[in-house]
Amino acid sequence: MKRVVVIGGGAAGLMAAVIAGREGAKVTLLEKMNYVGKKMGITGKGRCNITNACDMSDFIKNTPGNGKFLYGAYERFTNEDLLQLLHDAGLETKVERGGRVFPASDSALDVRNTFMKLMKHYGVDVHLEEPVKKLLVDDGVVTGVVTDRETYHADAVVIATGGKSYPATGSTGDGYMLAAQVGHKITDIRPSLVPIVTEESWVKDLMGLSLRNVELSVVAKNKVQAKMFGEMMFTHFGITGPIVLSLSHTVGKLMRKKNIGTIGLDINLKPALSPEILDKRLQKDFDLYSKKQLINGMKDLLPSRLIPLIIELAGIDPQKPINQISKEERQQIGYMLQHMPLTVKGLRPVEEAIVTAGGISLKEFNPKTMESKLVKGLYGAGEVLDIDAFTGGYNLQAAFSTGYVAAMHITHPEAF
């Protein structure tokens, strides 16, 4: 019977422990926090966005951080395989907008409890509040781990410690230290899926205002580098929300380039309308409210908190009577509605990121098996590896699939 130690009780570690146990290994899971699945519990606003119902090829497209590394893992363990495993264990799921999959109960706790039940069923030995201090390696082969309590001998070890985001959940970069101890290279650790800090101070006045069905573009070198449609929100420091988090990957990439210059953001508040149609819509509203002041004539078009700002950005007196607004001024308002400008100051720190970009270098891991090329019997799974995806369930699927593959290769190497 193979002895397997899994370090970390997040999505990747839980899957690796369950599958290795199911396939007949003697599994010990070591978690440094007081319970497992802590970070899973806060994904999807506490509902746990387990995966996405899209085609598996779309998972690669939605993983800008080294998505191609996951081809092998996704071939062996798909979103359908994951949902079947959870269904067989008694967890019902549902699909929401954008293909996002959640537990039918809307409770992340049910996902964690399902994995706890499976681990108990397969005899996984779970140790809580027991951080791993070092890996034991003899002549290029892993032989176990040392914790602050004792030494565990093993035939295989899976590092599934997560990244550096949300350190309160336990992901404080321990896995990087462990991998580096045995010779692995750690790539530049940085935030991904993180709010964006802007130069403009007026964002404070809009704090808490959410925008739906808008298009956000990232602009650098006079060119749109990336854009996304969906929801965003203003904060005291800048902007956040699903499309902001996803575009933060592009912003971070641009920030690391030399001579990139200013990175701008462009908010299109009316992406469904062409400039001509929008102008006609403005004309219609202006005809209706022709005797009012401009500040009082745009309430049908915009949230009230945005109106003064758009007028100011357009450079027009808000008290000006609408029947005195020129065609050029009206078109300038239309332009601002579709090109509301912001300037990137930076990203919030990695501790506030949903996902960490960077990690253990993938060059030193086999993408078909998740085994280290440097240390036999050592595996990496989940966010500790240099992989990061957009929001929508893609990061958790990457964790589940890599955890699955690591466990299957440990227990059935002949099948690879």
Give the predicted meaning of each segment:
Residues 3-29, 406-411:
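N-terminal Rossmann-like FAD-binding beta1-loop-alpha1 element of flavoenzymes
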Residues 5-7, 30, 132, 145, ...:
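Short hydrophobic core segments
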Residues 21-45:
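Glycine-rich FAD pyrophosphate-binding loop
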Residues 47-95:
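Glycine-rich active-site loop/strand segments that organize a redox cofactor
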